[in-house]
Amino acid sequence: MYKHVPLLSLLIFGAINASPALAWNTLDGLAPIVIGHRGASGYLPEHTLESYALAIQQGANFIEPDLVMTSDGHFIARHEPMLDSTTDVASKFGAERKTTRMVDGVSTTAYFADTFTLAEIKTLRAVQPRANRDQSHNGLYEIPTLDEVIVLAKSKGVGIYPELKHSTYMAGVFGANVFEDKLVSTLHAAYGNTSAAPVFIQSFETANLKYMNGQTNIRLVQLVDADDVNADGSMSLVAPYAQPYDIVAAGGSTTFADLLTAAGLAEIATYADGIGPWKPYLLKTVADGIDRNGDGDVDINDRRVDGSTGVIEAAHAAGLLVYTWTFRNDASGYGFANPQEEMEHYLKLGVDGVFTDFPDTGVAAVAAVPEPETYALMLAGLGLVAWRRRRH
């Protein structure tokens, strides 16, 4: 009955060790993941259980809850602590509930989540912040807690990819590391303290990730931002998108671009498992005067893609996963008119996952990239090492 077991073992061993035959150019040779960016936010108001459920239905492997805290210490899923653009807060509460705060060095007057209790937040309903998207679901869906998102994700067998929003700001409101400690304890209770958990914790700041590296084995991802892309294709670094804000607050000079140098990646590898760079960091582009997206204007989004910048390859050499963002059906660019083709290009370069507002398009992009016949066999063998903890 078991006479073929030795042969199968040899085949799996051979597949694992035959690097040229890897199914994908990802770090582990495994299929890249599709992350529902704020859920299926291209279709439904972002950061709602309904948006997350649709992302799961469309085939997303992970859903992304951005996290802020209420005044009574509950995590809720919002892209920013400011509630104005993504909820109907102005129709429920008067202007006297607005406050003026410094957020990443920018004076901001708004309705801040951390001045509302969870009970008050639960009276709000989400709205679609992008005017070009379907507004018919405005006012229908609640603002979910992290606990509610976890229950949904676990019930559907998908992972979560939470982002800690504005840790320096949150420390000023709640105290040093309260934000991080609460997240770690919540995730440990739900998933255990293990790198095998279907969870990634991400942040644009660095100090919070370094702190959490000492508190958890759950995988951590360093996000890398920029303000824009310059006319020559270089990255524009303008505050507040020039540096991680914890570095600004500490008087440091390290920029986001510095994080992607060889030295920067080596440093990240000491406290995180991956990087999350904005997608223009990954592609070299050339201006050649062609209107590739057909909008009648020749601009930065029409630049011809001219290969990799080497960031993906360098990150993989440092043992770091690469998850890039954000792909949108209604805002493709950087040399591509077709959003699925854009994602396919990044997938072929070797990114380990993509964030998209339209998870169905992401799933289609992954399916469209050819795989060798050995993929299923390699998946069986490589799955044994897929969840290893890389940082040290």
Where are the regions a protein language model picked out?
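Positively charged n-region of N-terminal signal peptides that target proteins for export
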Residues: M1-H4, E371, R388-H392
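Gram-negative bacterial Sec-dependent N-terminal signal peptides
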Residues: M1-L22, G383
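A residue-level detector for conformationally permissive "hinge/kink" positions
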Residues: P6, A15, D28-A31, E373-M378
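Intrinsically disordered, low-complexity segments enriched in polar/charged small residues
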Residues: L8-S9, G42-Y43, A380
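Phosphate-group recognition and catalysis centered on beta-loop-alpha active-site segments
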Residues: A21-A368
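A short, hydrophobic C-terminal helix/tail in secreted or cell-surface proteins
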Residues: P370-R388
